[in-house]
Swiss-Prot record:
It catalyses: L-glutamate 5-semialdehyde + phosphate + NADP(+) = L-glutamyl 5-phosphate + NADPH + H(+). Belongs to the gamma-glutamyl phosphate reductase family. Its EC number is 1.2.1.41. It comes from Xylella fastidiosa (strain Temecula1 / ATCC 700964). It comes from the Bacteria. SUPFAM superfamilies: ALDH-like (SSF53720). Keywords: Amino-acid biosynthesis, Cytoplasm, NADP, Oxidoreductase, Proline biosynthesis. It is found in: Cytoplasm. Its main location: cytoplasm. This is Gamma-glutamyl phosphate reductase. Pathway: Amino-acid biosynthesis; L-proline biosynthesis; L-glutamate 5-semialdehyde from L-glutamate: step 2/2. Pfam families: Aldedh.
Length: 425
């Protein structure tokens, strides 16, 4: 048995124990995990500093450094997030259907854990803690395979969380961190369909494509966020600028940050100069089509690749469109089914925008930054699914469970042949 198969088998065995834990036991475990992060803060931050030094040596971009970096405030927020997850309602055991059929059988649909979830991700060490906590809260085992750029941070975080499992007299193999960064090890992991029930890739386009193409396990992709804001002709200009600043500048490296601004031609002469002036203090680089460059001479001319880009940086692509249909067509062509925003005072246009786009989250007169599990009332999220399966959009605890039927009867049979069978003649 290979090493990675052995680890997955151990996680599978541990997951059976997690699936039987009471809500109170899981709450205490997650609170202990949060305390372990606080206790190991110095060790975790030192490991993260080493990761950051290595990343700077390799001259990675500012967006990657931001996703990788931890500080005392971010680490404290990670621990607080675990306490918040501990306090969330437990989805396991929830009855989603309760029915009695005419023949007397009692039918229920009940949420149960998925089993073992593999999380493959890049850069963000907070995902190590968040994903582990969410999966364990939902009664699942978790196999984590982070990126090489965060390996020291991830080991330090996982070590703290595994110690909490031991303190709770639970197998630490309920949480596995794969430390072998070789591509062939990840490839082997993706073949273990008999031991792993779901794989969630979260990272760059190359990683997600690799996982989707090679996995023999069901995959829920957390694809790139090419998010748009369309400013309709009837839009309130002040509102549109406020949403634009929030969506682009507050955390440009987030997957729910705006990447492209679409503007109706009727409002463009009034809106775009004001929007450009509002964005200037934040250092946002603007790239626009020819019509935009006519209104804003300092703007760089956008290429086709700009409209498909997830910048994760202070760069914004702009296009002026003649109508709502043109905006929808642009989003269908370049979007990633993540999050789209319309700013409009026309209810019919808002309804058309919502109905015509397949994106996981559609906002009407609200910031793209609300495309987040906490902001949408899920309490926490493991990511934002762009795969149209049972989980689409921000994935909370419910998305880490499945529903199964439990049927209780008093000896009912569907067909009733003679019993014992009549003797053959």
């Amino acid at each position: 048995m290979s090493h990675i198969r052995h680890l997955a088998q151990q996680c599978r065995d541990a997951a059976r124990i997690l699936a039987t834990l009471s809500t109170d036991a899981k709450r205490r475990l997650l609170e202990t995990m949060a305390t372990a992060l606080n206790t190991d803060a110095a060790t975790i931050l030192a490991a993260n500093a080493a990761d950051l030094d290595a990343a700077r040596t390799q001259q990675v971009g500012t967006a990657m450094l931001d996703r990788l970096a931890l500080d005392p405030q971010r680490l404290a927020a990670m621990a607080d997030a675990l306490r918040d997850i501990a306090a969330l309602p437990d989805p396991v055991g929830q009855v989603t259907r309760d029915d009695r059929r005419p023949n007397g059988i009692h039918i229920q649909k009940i949420r149960v854990p998925l089993g073992v979830i593999a999380m493959i991700y890049e850069a963000r060490p907070n995902v190590t803690a968040d994903a582990a906590a969410l999966c364990i809260k939902a009664g699942n085992g978790i196999i984590l395979r982070g990126g090489s750029e965060a390996i020291r941070s991830n080991i330090a975080i996982a070590t703290a969380l595994q110690r909490a499992l031991r303190l709770a007299s639970l197998p630490e193999t309920a949480l596995i961190l794969v430390q072998d960064m070789a591509r062939h090890t990840m490839l082997e992991l993706l073949q273990l369909s008999d031991l792993i029930d779901l794989v969630i890739p979260r990272g760059g386009e190359g990683l997600i494509r690799f996982v989707a193409e090679h996995a023999r396990i069901p995959v829920i992709k957390h694809y790139k966020g090419v998010c748009h804001q369309f400013v309709d002709a009837s839009a309130d200009i002040e509102m549109a600028i406020r949403l634009l600043i929030d969506g682009k500048t507050t955390r440009p490296a987030a997957c729910n940050a705006l990447e492209t601004l679409l503007v109706h031609t009727d409002i463009a002469p009034r809106f775009l100069p004001a929007a450009a002036a509002a964005l200037r203090p934040y250092g946002v680089q603007l790239r626009g089509d020819h019509a935009t460059c006519t209104l804003l001479p300092d703007v760089l001319l956008a290429t086709d690749a700009d409209y498909a880009a997830e910048y994760l940086d202070l760069i914004l692509a702009i296009r002026i469109v003649p109508n709502l249909d043109a905006a929808l067509e642009h989003i269908r062509r370049y979007g990633s089914d993540h999050t789209e925003v319309i700013v409009t005072a026309d209810p019919a246009h808002a309804d058309t925008f919502v109905q015509q786009l397949p994106s996981a989250v559609v906002m009407v007169n609200a910031s793209s930054r609300f495309s987040d599990g906490g902001a949408l009332g899920l309490g926490a999220e493991i990511g934002i699914s762009t795969t149209r399966l049972h989980a689409y959009g921000p994935m909370g605890l419910d998305a880490l469970t499945v529903e199964r039927f439990v049927v209780r009867g008093q000896g009912q049979v569907r067909h009733c042949p003679p019993y014992p069978p009549a003797p053959r003649r």
